[in-house]
């Protein structure tokens, strides 16, 4: 059976693993999931990620990051643009997550960017998710 929304599945797996204080989480890999993991790593929400070859397809392993007293680095993840309701934003209308404390992941013609990078480049696109 095919998955309707693989990005929502990825975000749910990361959210559930973080809430259960798991060290890592594994999922089927794709280019867009690897790009989202790269943004999460650059922004400091996860420790690291690897893409491994499996017998069938590839797997994406994400190492979660916690503070010294086991506080979560990811407070929340929210899927914005869904298959049934796409959400687009112009470069001057890009959303700020928690007044700039969080990150919006935007799919643009320049690839996946954070809201700040898209604002600096002057491009808009599809708002995939909020992370805070």
UniProtKB/Swiss-Prot annotation:
List the GO cellular component terms. ribonucleoprotein complex; ribosome
The organism sits in which domain of life?
A: Bacteria
Q: State one Pfam family annotation.
A: Ribosomal_S8
Is the keyword Zinc-finger in the record? no
Q: Which GO terms describe its molecular function?
A: rRNA binding; structural constituent of ribosome
The alphabetical list of record keywords is: Ribonucleoprotein, Ribosomal protein, RNA-binding, rRNA-binding
* Family annotation (InterPro entries): Ribosomal_uS8 (IPR000630), Ribosomal_uS8_sf (IPR035987)
Please list the GO biological process terms of this entry. Answer: translation
Q: What does this protein do?
A: One of the primary rRNA binding proteins, it binds directly to 16S rRNA central domain where it helps coordinate assembly of the platform of the 30S subunit.
Family note: Belongs to the universal ribosomal protein uS8 family.
Task: Identify this protein by name.
Answer: Small ribosomal subunit protein uS8
Q: Which organism is it from?
A: Corynebacterium jeikeium (strain K411)
- Name the gene that codes for it: rpsH
């Amino acid at each position: 059976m095919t998955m309707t929304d693989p990005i929502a599945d990825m975000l749910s797996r990361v959210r559930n693993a973080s809430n259960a204080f798991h060290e890592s989480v594994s999922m089927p890999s794709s280019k867009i999931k690897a790009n989202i993991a790269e943004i999460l790593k650059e922004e400091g929400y996860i420790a690291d990620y690897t893409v491994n070859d499996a017998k069938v397809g590839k797997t994406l392993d994400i190492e979660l990051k916690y503070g010294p007293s086991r506080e979560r680095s990811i407070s929340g993840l929210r899927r914005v643009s869904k298959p049934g309701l796409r959400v687009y934003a112009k470069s001057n209308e890009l959303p700020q997550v928690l007044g700039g404390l969080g990150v919006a992941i935007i799919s643009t013609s320049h690839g996946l960017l954070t809201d700040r990078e898209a604002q600096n480049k002057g491009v808009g696109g599809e708002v995939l998710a909020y992370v805070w």
